Amino acid sequence: MVHSDDGTDYTLSAQLLSYAMSIIEEAALPSSAYSLGGGTVLSYLFHHRKSKDIDLFVNDAQYMGALSPRFNEYSDRALSYNEDGNCIVLSFDEGKIDFIAATQITDYPAKMQSIFGQRIAVDDPVEIVCKKIYFRGNRAYPRDIFDLAVLYESSRRTDLITELKKYPDKVKQFADAFQKNRSDPCIEPYSTIYADSLLAGGKKFAGREFALCQMLLQELAGTA
C-alpha cells in the first residue's frame, strides 16, 4: 500500500502510475518529454481532497500517437478509451489515466521526485493550478475552484498571482465562468457536493472556496 504523510491511501494512484509508466516505456518517450500533474498531485501535497486519477502532461503532441491504444500494447489493455489530437483518456478498474499534450506555462518547472513508487518529473503546484485555468477555465469546475482556493491560501499565493497575471484573457474567461456558476442555484461548491471527499487539510476550506476565489479575482483585477 502507498500512503501520504497524513496517512491517505494512494495505492490506486500508484497502480495507475505504474500502468502509465509501462505505456510510456513502450512508447519510448524520453523522461524530459512528460511530467505528472493534476489534482492527485495537489491532493498528495496539500491533503485537501481525495483524488486518485493520474494526469500526465506531454510537452510535444508528436508523442501522442505512440501513447495511443491504436499503437501501444500497454495502452490497449485499458477497459475503454477516448482520444483526440491533444488528449488520451484511458479507463481502468482502478481509475483513469489522462495523457495531455501541453507545454509548461509558468516559470516553475517540473522537478524529478519520488512519488507513488516512481521516479518522475512532477509539476509545481502553481503550474498545476494555472493549467486548470489556462486550459479549462471556461468551465470553472467546482473541484478546480476548490484547488485554486487551497493554493491561494498557501505560502504560494504571490507566485500564483504573479503567474496568472501573465494570462489576463484566460483569467477573464475563468472569471466569467465562475460568476455564472456562482449565480446558478443548481451549482454548489465542491466542499458541499463532495463533503465526504474532504481530507484533513481541506476541511477548513469547507464553504469558503467561492469567497476565496472571489478574493483572488479581485486581487488580480487590482480591486482588492
Question: Where are each of the predicted segments found?
Answer:
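Compositionally biased terminal segments of proteins
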Residues: M1-A224
